Amino acid sequence: VRYGLSRHTVRKALGILAGDGYIESFQGKGTFCADVLRQIHGTGNIAVVTTYISDYIFPRLIQGIDEVLSDNGHSIILKNTGNSRQKEARFLEELISKGIDGLIIEPSKSELLCRHVSLYETLDKYQIPYIFIQGLYTEMQEKPHILMDDAGGGYLVTKHLLDSGRRNIAGFFKADDRQGIERHKGYVKALQEHEIAYDPDKVVWFHTEDRRKKPALMVRNMVRQN
């Protein structure tokens, strides 16, 4: 090894420097001087990372965020992960290195284990405030977040149908996001209150990858069977 140092010594030295905040390492990218990363504040840029941009409530959500940021002299940096963990991690690395004053983020596949917690720890280290919306990783329950009452919503819509005299109620829930898990809880609660047995054949779980095909296919199958 150059300079006559063993690899073990080099790794130990880098570990000490990283622990003291002098350097920052990114998997697949390399090791960088932390002085560069400390220049991230004062940019006036607030990053908004969502799973989708044009679907569901996101257009209005993003519009509202942008209006508030603009009124307060900030600029928005918009990123769309497509609910991909890999994209989320890549965007976080990019945003940290380029410089942001804050982050609003909807986590990707929030019900699954987050394997890039270290990137959020980097945000904490450099005192970059961030807040989760729409979902929250299980490992980060203590972090600032704004969530809808998905369990309550699942309960209310199911209860409405039951109160209307319906008994054969199917439920479609997303398995890899927190919202789907919580809505399922509400669905189950409403059935239990009306003393209706839970039927797993009436529950369809789908994932990000098959969200555009599986629900429609299962609806057609259910209609044919009835």
Where do the PLM segments sit?
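N-terminal helix-turn-helix DNA-binding module of bacterial transcription factors
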Residues: 1-41
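Bacterial carbohydrate/catabolite-sensing allosteric modules
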Residues: 20, 67-75, 90-101, 114-226
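A short, flexible N-terminal coil/short beta segment enriched in small residues
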Residues: 28, 40-49, 163, 168, ...
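Residue-level marker for beta-strand->alpha-helix junctions and adjacent short loops that shape enzyme
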Residues: 30, 53, 110-111, 137, ...
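Amphipathic helical "hinge" segments at domain boundaries
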Residues: 37-102, 109, 188, 192-193
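Short, flexible, glycine-rich and Lys/Arg-enriched loop motifs at helix boundaries
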Residues: 37-43, 106-120, 207
